[in-house]
Structures are given as C-alpha cells and as structure tokens.
Amino acid sequence: MARSVVVALLVLLSLSGLEAIQHAPKIQVYSRHPAENGKPNFLNCYVSGFHPSDIEVDLLKNGKKIEKVEHSDLSFSKDWSFYLLYYTEFTPNEKDEYACRVSHVTFSTPKTVKWDRTM
C-alpha cells in the first residue's frame, strides 16, 4: 500500500514538472496546391513542437485577421509537444499578402510568418 502511494506521488510530481518545460512553436505557412492567381486554394498554418498548449493562431490577409478560419483538434506528439493546423479557403492574386500570426508564452511578442507563394 505504501509503495503504491509513493509511486502515485512520483507520477504526479513528474507530470506537474511537464508544465514547467516550454518549447517555442515551429510555424509553417503553405498552400494546399501550387499558387495560381484567381484559382481557389487553401491557406494552411501548421504550428508544431510547442509546450505548454496555450496558443493563439491567426491567419492574416494584408495584416488583418481572417474571420472564417477552421482548425484541427489540439494533438500531441511522442515527446508531449503539441501541434495544430489552421486553414482557410482563399483565392491568391498578385496584390494580397497572407501570413500566420502566433502568440505563445515562449514569444515576447507575437511572431508572424508570411506565406511564400513560390514554396
């Protein structure tokens, strides 16, 4: 009985220690298909490798937040870091700029990554 209590306490202590570990998210912005002006596509922002799980992700068009955005469920990897995919339908053209802005405890200010249409 005493041994199982000690084991349970060790498990709880190790789990509480996970919250202290912080990892900055990796941000990847890409389109589902190669960009063609005037042709509908999907803009994706894949955010991975972050811890803790609290995160704010916005897709931007010309610096303004896009309202109609969907995202995957929060998931975690084998190393207990988290990942998410945010996406929206869009139609690229020559004049509009698209980006993904991420706020996380590991950043002193939000980080913005622009979509490179050549990637």
From Swiss-Prot:
Disulfide bonds join C45-C100. One of its GO terms (biological process) is immune response. CDD domains: IgC1_beta2m. Keywords: Disulfide bond, Immunity, Immunoglobulin domain, MHC I, Secreted, Signal. SMART domains: IGc1 (SM00407). The keyword Transferase does not apply. Residues 25-114 form the Ig-like C1-type domain. One of its GO terms (cellular component) is MHC class I protein complex. It is found in: Secreted. The keyword Signal applies. Residues 1-20 form the signal peptide. Component of the class I major histocompatibility complex (MHC). Involved in the presentation of peptide antigens to the immune system. Heterodimer of an alpha chain and a beta chain. Beta-2-microglobulin is the beta-chain of major histocompatibility complex class I molecules. Belongs to the beta-2-microglobulin family. This is Beta-2-microglobulin. It comes from Ateles paniscus. The lineage of its organism: Eukaryota, Metazoa, Chordata, Craniata, Vertebrata. The gene is B2M.
